[in-house]
Amino acid sequence: MEKWFIASKRADFNKIGEIFHISPVTARLMRNRSLTTVREMQRYLYGSLSDLYDSHLLKDADKGAEIIKEKIETGKKIRIISDYDVDGVSSNYILYQGLKRCGADVDYKIPDRVEDGYGINEHLIEKAAEDGIDTIITCDNGIAAAEQIAYGNSLGLTLIVTDHHDIPFQRQEDGSISYNLPSAAAVINPKQKDCPYPFENICGAVVVYKFIQVLYDLFGIDRRESEVFLEIAAMATVCDVMPLCDENRIIVKEGLRRIQHTNITGLQALIEANHLEEKKISSYHFGFILGPCINASGRLTSAKDALELLLCEDKELCRQKAEALTQLNAERKEMTANGVKAAKEYLESTGHANDKVLVVYLPNCHESIAGIIAGRMKEHYHKPVFVITRTKEGLKGSGRSIEAYHMYKEMNKIKECFDKFGGHPMAAGFSMQEDRLEEFREKLNANATLTEDDFAEKVHIDVALPISYLSESLINEFELLEPFGNENTKPLFAQKDLYIKGMRVLGTTGRCLKLFLSDANGTSIDAMYFGESDVFLEELISFCGKEEAQRIQKGLSHHIWMDVTYYPQVNEWRGQKNIQIVIQN
């Protein structure tokens, strides 16, 4: 079930168009992204690195830099401990290279997803002490590790936490909230309530990018040297699904510009392994091609493989490593498809598909892909989904949510069910014992206040734009709005009453449908639909009947008109350009 909404934000779109030399349509698209002032729009369209916030505003960044400077100058050993996803690997890379530039004696460890689980733990701390490490810096983890940090302190280690995740909290009997910060020598996280940094929604890699800038300032190193990390910080921002607004937009835009001629040999090899060297790389390539290759190592082997690729400078070795990661990602895709199929079968067979919050138990699923499966299931059912699998220590799970359900807060209400948990409003991870599974499902659903309205997929349309209005110049102008992603989605347009003149299935898999459409005034346009063509045809039959559907497929006259949402594009084939639309709904 879907509900379509057309944005109705008001402004003088002609005036905005005149100021920025753009069409009123593009002006409307900017207003739909909650931009109200000329300054905001100027920064959105043409923001540069000079518009980024002062790194020194991050609470404890200066304090942490002073500590690290003293450790470097006295020859102390430093160890980085990161997460194993794209943001964790990227954070580790930036921190390692930045500390090396400052002369640090530094190494790194990345927790094994299966053996160690998420984040810093007692074993990693003990190993650091055994190895003669003086200082541990966490990145993309540590904010929820108060006990582990305290244990490190007891062993005489210096610990610095850099993270971007939500601060753990407890709700008191009087309704007030108390936050539980780790007792590290410095805690650098923009989500701290007393942190003056103006924008809290940055990823772990951007946090350490900012920290390295502060460190460079302290060492008298030109901070422009830190710009070599921008393409890595940009990739992490997209892959960690940070909102692509404010300074994140600038970082990603600049990173995409630089990646076309990156000096990071391993990253260039990964681009070539995925046959992207001749393409203009976009946020899509970060999120759906390059990022998943880096993630695949942390999921199926070791995230060290991905980090070693980024650190490697030998072209042939980089080529081998990049091809291995690309192949690993192909295996991950197949495992995911099998897992999604099993998850749907589980829900239907248990009768839990009707629950408000879906809890799927797949004991034999590889724990590393539980989050991906949860995401696919959320898209299919449009409900919050937890996918849980069995491990040596008990159960581990990942959750993905919908807008109406704050996953982390809901889990915090039943924290007695977990051994460990953490996350965001839209995603979470946890571990628990098997005898808690049914209690977990029951309590989540008992507490859930979700309604059928919350489960309806909400389709937000930017503009009802007739196909007759489309032109190549207008479509090219929409590129000003890139990069697209979370909170800066690709614009969605709508057209009512399109007549289907014909259609045909393309490709061997049948997953692509080409339609030939026209409006009431006779304007014709080609359209592509990249969903399940058989599902599309089934819905067509259910809507208009088998006989009428067959007439449509054969290109015969009929009485069916279709409403669509779409994004326009300029298609080039054998030197010829034509405008087509890609149907979304």
Give the positions of each predicted feature.
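Mid-to-C-terminal polyanion-binding domains and interfaces
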Residues: 70-74, 315-361, 413-585
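Short alpha-helical basic/polar micro-motif
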Residues: 206, 371, 375, 564
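Hydrophobic helix-and-loop "lid/oligomerization" segment in the mid-to-C-terminal part
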Residues: 7-135, 154-156, 173-175, 183, ...
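Histidine-centered active-site/metal-ligand motif
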Residues: 164-165, 366, 424, 512
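Catalytic domains of riboflavin
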Residues: 1-3
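Short, well-ordered strand-loop elements centered on a beta-strand within folded domains, enriched
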Residues: 176-179, 185-187, 393-401, 524-528, ...
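Active-site cavity-forming subdomains of large catalytic enzyme subunits
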Residues: 126-205, 209-218, 228, 245
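Conserved beta-strand positions in the Rossmann-like core of class I SAM-dependent methyltransferases
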Residues: 107, 160, 540
